[in-house]
Amino acid sequence: MQLHKFYFQGMMLPLLQTKVWKFLMSQIGNHAFMQKFVELLNSASPKLAVELIAPDAVFNSVITGREHTGPSGYLEILAALKAGFPDVRWELQELVGEGNVVAARFNISGTHLGEFQGIKPGGKEVRISAMNLYRLKSGKVVKEFNQFDNLSLLWQIGVYPPME
């Protein structure tokens, strides 16, 4: 068995090449990947999109209501969201991963300053949550499943009357 050095709170701990070691390394890798992915969500950088998304990745978007493929397709989704909420910010709240699957919970905030899903801007600030499940292959997203709190967003921008 191979011995690895793992540092925890400044102490070096020897770990054997075990399932525990592989699990720890996958968690560290998943966290680093998602930090970079949040950067993509907030910047809509084409360079990051190519780095993090496989060319044949598939995305079914509740934002646009259709399927998108690859880095350019994902950028279309982000552009549709930014068109309605130019100051949109994604914040990673929780992350769980196992092997090539990563689940992430986000808070999303922004101001409705542009048209979104056919709804004229009203200038209202919104804060919603999203749960996304990412399937990774060779360090890139190949599939995303998402649950975007669209109903709450529509309430907050005034499409539906406030809940009492």
Spans of features found by a protein language model:
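C-terminal and inter-domain tail/linker signature
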Residues: 10-12, 16-164
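Short, low-complexity intrinsically disordered segments enriched in A/P/G/S/L with frequent Arg
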Residues: 1-3, 13-14
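Cationic, low-complexity basic patches in intrinsically disordered or flexible, solvent-exposed regions
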Residues: 3-6, 23
